[in-house]
């Protein structure tokens, strides 16, 4: 029986999904059809999604820098997302 690797749940892997959900929230809020309570909930969710997307972009940028470092051309270490600061 083949082993299935668990799905990647890193921010980089979830970036597209988070961005799509954020764009949908913005569209819903721009229509003006949401109540105040719904708008606040959507805003809270939007902030969380924005932070996830921002973290994913930071990780991707760091990953590119590590891979592009001319001082370490033979460095074959896998990227460790825990080295990226998650504090905002």
From Swiss-Prot:
Heterooligomer composed of large and small subunits. Residues 69-88 are annotated as: Disordered. The lineage of its organism: Bacteria, Pseudomonadati, Pseudomonadota, Gammaproteobacteria, Lysobacterales. PANTHER family: EXODEOXYRIBONUCLEASE 7 SMALL SUBUNIT. Bidirectionally degrades single-stranded DNA into large acid-insoluble oligonucleotides, which are then degraded further into small acid-soluble oligonucleotides. NCBIfam families: PRK00977.1-4, xseB. Belongs to the XseB family. SUPFAM superfamilies: XseB-like (SSF116842). It comes from Xylella fastidiosa (strain M12). Keywords: Cytoplasm, Exonuclease, Hydrolase, Nuclease. Its EC number is 3.1.11.6. This is Exodeoxyribonuclease 7 small subunit. GO terms for biological process: DNA catabolic process.
